[in-house]
Amino acid sequence: MIRCTDINEITPFSSFISKIPNHCGTHMDASRHFVKDGLSINELPIGYFCHKDVVLLEVPKGEAEGITKEDLEPYAAILAQVSFAFLCTGFEKYRTENPLIYQNEGPYIATSAGKYLSDNYPNLKGVGIWFPCTWFAVFSCT
């Protein structure tokens, strides 16, 4: 972190520049990220990002291990009822235990899972891999 300004007689605020690698934090990919004619993030209405029916599913995964269709099939009845699903892999433990593994070898949603979800769950608007911040990690997947 680099300090840009600090509070003094001339500057009434403090600010920093933070540098972090992409995929270390929160972001969303719209369908245009993977589908040539899909909507871009700025074309989606704000309501698309608001969800009342949300689930946290436990899908344990290791280093660079994909979440597959087979991992999600046991949750079919639940997925049919929600508009957003978080997938808890247990990988958040590496955030403090081994930050390099956390940053570079995280689990991912495999093509088979993406196709399965898009083909079978039209009400599902989003899927995310649950990576809680450090202070919250002890409460995840319990």
Swiss-Prot record:
GO terms for cellular component: membrane. Keywords: Membrane, Transmembrane, Transmembrane helix. One of its GO terms (biological process) is L-tryptophan catabolic process to kynurenine. The chain crosses the membrane at residues 75-91. It is found in: Membrane. Its main location: membrane. GO terms for molecular function: arylformamidase activity. It is a single-pass membrane protein. Pfam families: Cyclase (PF04199). This is Uncharacterized protein HI_1016.
